[in-house]
Amino acid sequence: MKVNLEWIIKQLQMIVKRAYTPFSNFKVACMIIANNQTFFGVNIENSSFPVTLCAERSAIASMVTSGHRKIDYVFVYFNTKNKSNSPCGMCRQNLLEFSHQKTKLFCIDNDSSYKQFSIDELLMNGFKKS
């Protein structure tokens, strides 16, 4: 499957505005493609910080709720120009759970620059079910 990264970035730039970030204003949006279907998620902060939901896990929940189990592509959009943005450890483990060897992950900054990773580059020697 060929992806239109320009279109995906435009979608994520619209979706990221829905993030609920009253504490950090660090907005993140995620788009997952699984079996040619798209699933979106945004980060949702909570005053009880451990209850906060990351955009990646939000998108995974949408995908699983729709009956899908294997991620083909992950696009994570950050509202900063940090150049070193990437999923947190908890999200990396969640992404690994539903990824396969060919899963591709893109980390995109708000200037549309991006870095591409494989799941193994993102979480080397991650814990996997047998």
From Swiss-Prot:
Its cofactor is Zn(2+). Keywords: Hydrolase, Metal-binding, Zinc. Substrate binds at N43, I44, E45. Zn(2+) binds at C54, C88, C91. It catalyses: cytidine + H2O + H(+) = uridine + NH4(+); 2'-deoxycytidine + H2O + H(+) = 2'-deoxyuridine + NH4(+). Binds 1 zinc ion. CDD domains: cytidine_deaminase. Residues 3-130 form the CMP/dCMP-type deaminase domain. The active site is at E56. NCBIfam families: cyt_deam_tetra, PRK05578.1. Homodimer. This enzyme scavenges exogenous and endogenous cytidine and 2'-deoxycytidine for UMP synthesis. Belongs to the cytidine and deoxycytidylate deaminase family. This is Cytidine deaminase. It comes from Mycoplasma genitalium (strain ATCC 33530 / DSM 19775 / NCTC 10195 / G37).
